[in-house]
Structures are given as structure tokens and as C-alpha cells.
């Protein structure tokens, strides 16, 4: 494996400015991303140390059924003894979800190792699974390349209810069929049989979307000791009881400062990423595994569609006695994370960076300090076949991103078309049109009214000429299919859906090609968090 670092123009203006000094975005964050910030944040955490024994026990209890590695055990011991964490999270996507879920986990691990060395203190990697999320349409599918076409492959079982990923049971038969469909699209290699067995074995041990995701992630990163926790885990929810109480007690103020901060963010030119409102309670109520977003109205916490209505006292009692009935939203999740973990830095993507920019004052409302925001690593995997095609056509990866492969494909298709055949068909059409015109004139002289039939007949001939032209063009394309397919492959592999590969494909198509050691090889590379984009040549 070879690693190449390249500079790519950052289209997201929040992220672009975050990596630039002296830009307006930095006023929305407690820290910039530099060594001094990590030293300062570590000092702050040391001054606000807390007992982490109960938290450690909850993570251990969650992870034991997944299989605790020696390294994970070491990290749990360090956490119990007061270690700081680098934390990132993601929804419980099918087959781990898009590649950026894996890239985020790698970012967490890399940064934890780096800061452990720099600070000479224990820093452990933690992955927060957003099992409380209920938008299953976002996590129930993946993409593959089938022939030349990009195919969306979805798990067929649908739920009419907005149940959380952690409460949605998997249909093993449907999921097994989904796995076989995805792997069949990817194609047969020496690793395929073992890959299918591995996925089906993990599936058979899993009950829910979150369970399946957690087991796969643990399998991929157990040697690195990545600690996992499900946001919807029952024991974790009990641990968060007091924190929910704080959020409820300060609900109005949190909503107000987030709304004001987002308005300021918009005035500064960064838009409104979360569309905050002053009525937002920033909590969901969970009923039979289904989440209902609450808002405040006349001193009540309500969801009219679900016929829910609570007084502040009633909601505080729920937080105290039944915290599993509460769930965080985009605003309260980072606050809950800060109240729960000793967060040195949070690893997130461009979207998360934008909404975190609205939260600085919300942290202050709860007497918290916003941690360092670490943008995740961005990577593109270049297979041997793709690298060969790039060399053959003298293209770079950035050329493909900029549309050059598509331009070359269109130019090639234009150049190979049979111009003479097209000219002859046009001549035949012109000759026939002249003959129809002569016939129409003659019939008019004979007072034979057949205009409609003539027009219809001429239209039928025109359709036949079009059909003939299309068939000739398709035959020419078929003749040059091998060359055309090469350009299509470059586009599908490196810029699918007109976006980065990491947003479309899951990692298993690359495990199928490279083998089960891919993650270990990726983690051997020398990364640093920054504004570069990494190319990984397999």
C-alpha cells in the first residue's frame, strides 16, 4: 500500500475557513486546531477531573458481547484511571455505512495515538454509535457497481414506524439475501467466500441494526482497542439521567442561545445548518422504540402528532426515573457527550463542523467548555486496476474529480461515430422527403385529399430512419465497449454520484479485493489531521 497526500480545493466554506487562520469562523469555537489547543484543553480536563469507573463499567458491559480485545481492555483500564478520550460517532449504517464511517474511526484512533505521545498522557479512542437515530432510510442501503451501472442496493425490510436503529430488529433472511446481492455485484475473488461467511456469521449473532454495526466495527478495529458505546444503550441512558435533568432545566436558555448563535453564523456568511427555533426542547421522547421530537409551548413539552404533553416537572421525573425514554437531538447530543466523557477532541465531518458552530454558547449555559473540533481524515482508495487505467490514459485522480474522464469518454464516443453512415441516412431522408413532396403535389392536382395519410406515412419512415441511426450508433459503441468501459470505471470508482468515493461505497468491496488485512494496512500509514486528502493505492 502506498499513501499520497494531495491538496484539494475545499468546497465547504465552513471547513475551508476552519483550516485558515484569522477567519470569522473561529469565533464560533473555543479552540483552533493546534498543539497549544490540545495542551490547554488537557489542562482544563485535569482541573475538572471526574470519577470514570461507572462509565468504564458501562462501556465494558456493552462491549463484552462483541468480544473484548486485549487492547480494548487496556484502554478501559486507562479510562477508569482518568484517561482523556478522542471521540467520534456515526449512525449504525448497514455494512458499516459509507467508507467515511471507517475513515472517522481511523481518524479517532490516529489522533488518540498522536496526542498520547505529545501530551505524555493516556488518551483513548471512543466511537459513539448513534443508535438512537430513527431515519432508517439513511442507513438501510449501500451502492455497488453492477456491470457499468451504479446500483443502490437496499435492505428490503421496511418499518412504517420511526423506530430507533437500536430498537429495529433485523430480518436475518432478508439481510442474508442483501449481503449475497451486494457481494455478487462486487465480483468473485479469492477472498469472497470467507467474506460472505464472516458477514453472515456476524449477522447471525446480531439482533438490530446497531448490534450488526457494532459487531462489524469491533471486528475491524479490535486490534486498535477502539471503544464502542451505543447512545441508546439502556445502562448508558441510566448513567445520563442527571445530565438529562440539566438539559431540561436549561431548555429555554439552550434553545435561545443556539438560535441567536445560528443567526450570527448566518450573518457571518455560513448559513443556517440546523434551523434552530426558540421553541425547541432539543430532546426526543421514546415510546415503544419510536422517537418523537418535543417542543416547548406554554410551559409544556409537547408533540401534538404523537399526542404527547408533559409539564416540566413530569419530564424531570422521567429523566430521573426512566431516562431510557429520552433521546438527544443534534443540539443536545454534543452537550450530553461532554457531560459524559472527558473529551479532549471530537472528530467530525464538514456537516458536523457546521452545526457545532452554533453550540458554543449552549455549552456555556451548562457550565461546560466546548472541546476541540478535529475534522476527520478524507481518503480515496485507488485499486490496482484503477491505477493502471489512470496511467493508461495519463490521468490523475483529481483529473477524474474535475470531470476529465467524462470529457474524454464523450470525445471518444463522438470521434468513433460513423459519420458516413449518418450522412447516407440523412441523404436518404432528404430524397424521400422530396419524393413525398412530389407525390403530395400530384395528389392535390388530382383533388385526392390524402394529406393526413401522407404525413403519417412520412412520420413512420422518419421513425425508422431514427431507429436505424440509433442501431448503427449502438453497434459502434458495442464495438468500442472495452475503451468506453475504462472511462466509466474511472468515474464510478473515483467520483460516483458526482461525489467522493467515501460518501458512496462501503468498505467491504475493498476487503473483497485486498483482503481482511486492509484496515491494518491502512492504519500503518502515516496520517495527520489537516486539510489534505489522502490517496491510498492498494
Swiss-Prot record:
Residues 419-445 form a coiled coil. One of its GO terms (molecular function) is ligase activity. It comes from the Bacteria. It is an enzyme of class 6 (ligase). Pfam families: CC_BshC, Rossmann-like_BshC. InterPro entries: Bacillithiol_biosynth_BshC, CC_BshC, Rossmann-like_BshC. Keywords: Coiled coil, Ligase. The keyword Coiled coil applies. Its EC number is 6.-.-.-. Involved in bacillithiol (BSH) biosynthesis. May catalyze the last step of the pathway, the addition of cysteine to glucosamine malate (GlcN-Mal) to generate BSH. HAMAP family: BshC (MF_01867). Belongs to the BshC family. This is Putative cysteine ligase BshC.
Amino acid at each position: 500500500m502506498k499513501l499520497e497526500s494531495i491538496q484539494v480545493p475545499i468546497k465547504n466554506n465552513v471547513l475551508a475557513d476552519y483550516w485558515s487562520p484569522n477567519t470569522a469562523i473561529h469565533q464560533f469555537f473555543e479552540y483552533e486546531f493546534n498543539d497549544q489547543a490540545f495542551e490547554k484543553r488537557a489542562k482544563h480536563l485535569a482541573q475538572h477531573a471526574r470519577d470514570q469507573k461507572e462509565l468504564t463499567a458501562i462501556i465494558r458491559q456493552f462491549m463484552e458481547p462483541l468480544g473484548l480485545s486485549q487492547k480494548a481492555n487496556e484502554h478501559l483500564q486507562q479510562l477508569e484511571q482518568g484517561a482523556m478520550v478522542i471521540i467520534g460517532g456515526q449512525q449504525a449504517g448497514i455494512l458499516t455505512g459509507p467508507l467515511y464511517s471507517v475513515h472517522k474511526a481511523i481518524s479517532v484512533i490516529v489522533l488518540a495515538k498522536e496526542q498520547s505521545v505529545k501530551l505524555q498522557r493516556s488518551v483513548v479512542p471512543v466511537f459513539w454509535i448513534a443508535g438512537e437515530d430513527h431515519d432508517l432510510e439513511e442507513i438501510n442501503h449501500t451502492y455497488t457497481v453492477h456491470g457499468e451501472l451504479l446500483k443502490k442496493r437496499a435492505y428490503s425490510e421496511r418499518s412504517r414506524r420511526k423506530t430507533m436503529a437500536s430498537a429495529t430488529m433485523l430480518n436475518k433472511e432478508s439481510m442474508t439475501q442483501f449481503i449475497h446481492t451486494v457481494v455478487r455485484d462486487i465480483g468473485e475473488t479469492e477472498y469472497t467466500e470467507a467474506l460472505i461467511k464472516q458477514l453472515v456469521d456476524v449477522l447471525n449473532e446480531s439482533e438490530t441494526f446497531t448490534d450488526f454495526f457494532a459487531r462489524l466495527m469491533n471486528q475491524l478495529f479490535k486490534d486498535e482497542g477502539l471503544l464502542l458505546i451505543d447512545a441508546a444503550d439502556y445502562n448508558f441512558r441510566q448513567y445520563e439521567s442527571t445530565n438529562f435533568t440539566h438539559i431540561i432545566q436549561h431548555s429555554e436558555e439552550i434553545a435561545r442561545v443556539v438560535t441567536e448563535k445560528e443567526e450570527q453564523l448566518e450573518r457571518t456568511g455560513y448559513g443556517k445548518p440546523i434551523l434552530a427555533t426558540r421553541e425547541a426542547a432539543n430532546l426526543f421522547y421514546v415510546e415503544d422504540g419510536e422517537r418523537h421530537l418535543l417542543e416547548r409551548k406554554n410551559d409544556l413539552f409537547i408533540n401534538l402528532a404523537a399526542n404527547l404533553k408533559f409539564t416540566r416537572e413530569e419530564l424531570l421525573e422521567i429523566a430521573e426515573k426512566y431516562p431510557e425514554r429520552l433521546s438527544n437531538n443534534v443540539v443536545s447530543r454534543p452537550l450530553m457527550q461532554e457531560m459524559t466523557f472527558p473529551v479532549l477532541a471530537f472528530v467530525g465531518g464538514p456537516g458536523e463542523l457546521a452545526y457545532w458552530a452554533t453550540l458554543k454558547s449552549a455549552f456555556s449555559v451548562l457550565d461546560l467548555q466546548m472541546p476541540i473540533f478535529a475534522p476527520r481524515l478524507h481518503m480515496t482508495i485507488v485499486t490496482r486496476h484503477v491505477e493502471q487505467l489512470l496511467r493508461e490514459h495519463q490521468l490523475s485522480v483529481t483529473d477524474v474529480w474535475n470531470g476529465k474522464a467524462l470529457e474524454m469518454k464523450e470525445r471518444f464516443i463522438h470521434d468513433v461515430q460513423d459519420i458516413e453512415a449518418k450522412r447516407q441516412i440523412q441523404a436518404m431522408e432528404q430524397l424521400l422527403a422530396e419524393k413525398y413532396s412530389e407525390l403530395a403535389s400530384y395528389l392535390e392536382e388530382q383533388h385526392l385529399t390524402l394529406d393526413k395519410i401522407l404525413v403519417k406515412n412520412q412520420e413512420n419512415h422518419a421513425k425508422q430512419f431514427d431507429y436505424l441511426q440509433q442501431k448503427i450508433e449502438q453497434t459502434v459503441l458495442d464495438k468500442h465497449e472495452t475503451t468506453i468501459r475504462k472511462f466509466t470505471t474511472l468515474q464510478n470508482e473515483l467520483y460516483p454520484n458526482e461525489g467522493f468515493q467515501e460518501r458512496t461505497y462501503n468498505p467491504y468491496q475493498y476487503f473483497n479485493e485486498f483482503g481482511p488485512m486492509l484496515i491494518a494496512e491502512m492504519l500503518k500509514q502515516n496520517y495527520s489531521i489537516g486539510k489534505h486528502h489522502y490517496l491510498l493505492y492498494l
